[in-house]
Amino acid sequence: MAAIDHGADAVYIGASRFGARAAVGNSVDDIRKLCDYAHCFGAKVYVTVNTIVYNDELETTRQLLLDLSDAGADAILVQDMAVLEMMDGLPMAAHASTQTDNRSAEKVRWLRDVGFSRVVLARELSLDEIREIHSQVPDVELEVFVHGALCVSYSGICYASQYCFGRSANRGECAQFCRMKFSLQDSNGREVLHDRYLLSLKDMNRVDHLEDLVEAGASSFKIEGRLKDLSYVKNVTAAYSQRLNALIRRHPDLYCRSSQGVCSYNFTPDLNRTFNRGYTTYFLHGRMPDIASMDTPKAMGAFVGMVKEIRHDSFNVAGVASFANGDGLCFLDEARQLIGFRANKVVGNRIYPYRMPHGLKPGTRLYRNNDQEFDRLMSKPSAERRIPICMTLRDVADGFELSASIHDKKYTLHYPAALQQAQKPPHDNIIRQLTKLGDTIYVCEAVDIPAGFNYFIPNSLLSDMRRQLVEKLVSQREEPLQLDVAKPSACAPYAYPYLNNIANQMARDFYGAKELSAYELKGGDGPIMQCRHCIRYALGYCVKHGGQRPVWQEPLSLILGDGRRFTLEFDCKNCQMNVYAS
């Protein structure tokens, strides 16, 4: 609900099962309450049922979909085509999860043809690629990620967690293989790099590129917010909502928000004060250097200055940042290890840690990964969302009509009453009583009363009129969407059959296939990860992009801390790095 209050037009939420975060779930009753609240603002609720489903779970999934439909969910985010089949006839839209690996116009067209109204595109796509997909498939909504954590593999075709730990990312149990330490060896056993986070990416931040994305064909912006705290949800939602509003103000004839309500904030959104591993626009403008966070997978936060002078119990910081008692601070030592500590006391720019951290030296770059003052601010009520309405009061033969207008919609109620001439001008009192909307989600901007209106209306009746009108506004719901699910022809587009993620008979029948099975069921000898992130490029050795010629003997291998080895294949033709279990 905090995301709605801070400006979201829609929210994703996981149900009790089959969401992409198995450890986090919400009851149907909680989802119903969220739907009721969101729908007051015309905002939507999308429920994630985007894992693959096994045969013995099909009936449970079917019942869950029925329950979610009854709760008022607007759409279901889908990976397994059995879920799409079971949605046939239910009044919810089907959105294709990024877990369906959506990186080509061909794939997006196929998803549209089988019944999806919206496709969440792969995070890796550039503006040009998004634009090309939109030009070829203009009649499907394209949702793009704009902020948050990045998976290093194309989503839906990462099997590293399943291979290593028996925990499938396609079942919502990702073990964060890409946030682990690896050493890099060449084929002669020479160590190129030791104990680095070679697959760990920075976090996405595209707040400065919303207009570019809209012009390319994006119709929805997605913030990755799973497993994040309340402060993150509030701050990031508000930041993007404000930027989107600014975009609409520049182009009022082209764009509008899909929900209602004006937000007022008790804080200034600042993305640097929220959890982040450093920011990147990823591949939005093509391949760029420095998208990885190889020193640490943890949040370093914003740079706050350089360590200047060190004493036995304190140090001071050169810079303009202000600090607070309890701030979490960190730095990288000479071995590029992240060292974190708390500020016990702050006096100006002098910081007294609980314990002086080892390795801190003059000239060290200091970061703040926990902003105590900002967190305190975010822990309080920080935003209010109200829907502006305009009221109109008219006299009719047997009483009064009170209307409320919201944008282009008008809601009218009739109140039988005897018409009594007022002894003194009634307008001021009528306006005062009708605009007392208190803790409702509405704010009255104007009350239109005819100039010749001169009737006495008791305050008790005015209060009843106001209350009944608000109840009518709150009770309004959009008509449910009727979904038609088309039947596809047999489709097995991948070189490695398990990449279709078919884990049950219903999905197998959907594809018209007999032998295709998910990696989780039968394994496979193909890549366990396909990545646009390229370690060779990141280290400056991509000849295709002007780098120097490699000094090592390929193939390269990633060595996990427990000794397991993973071979890297550089598919330069497709500008892709594949990871194989050795």
List each language-model region with its residue ranges.
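Surface-exposed amphipathic alpha-helical tracts and adjacent flexible/coil segments at the periphery
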Residues: M1-D5, A10-A20, D30, L34-C35, ...
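An active-site metal/cofactor-coordinating segment within enzyme catalytic domains
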Residues: A23-S27
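Short glycine-enriched loops at secondary-structure junctions
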Residues: T51, Q79-V83, T100-N102
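Short active-site loop/helix that positions an aromatic residue
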Residues: L84-G89
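Short, glycine/polar-rich helix-capping loops at beta-to-alpha or helix-loop-helix junctions
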Residues: R103-K107
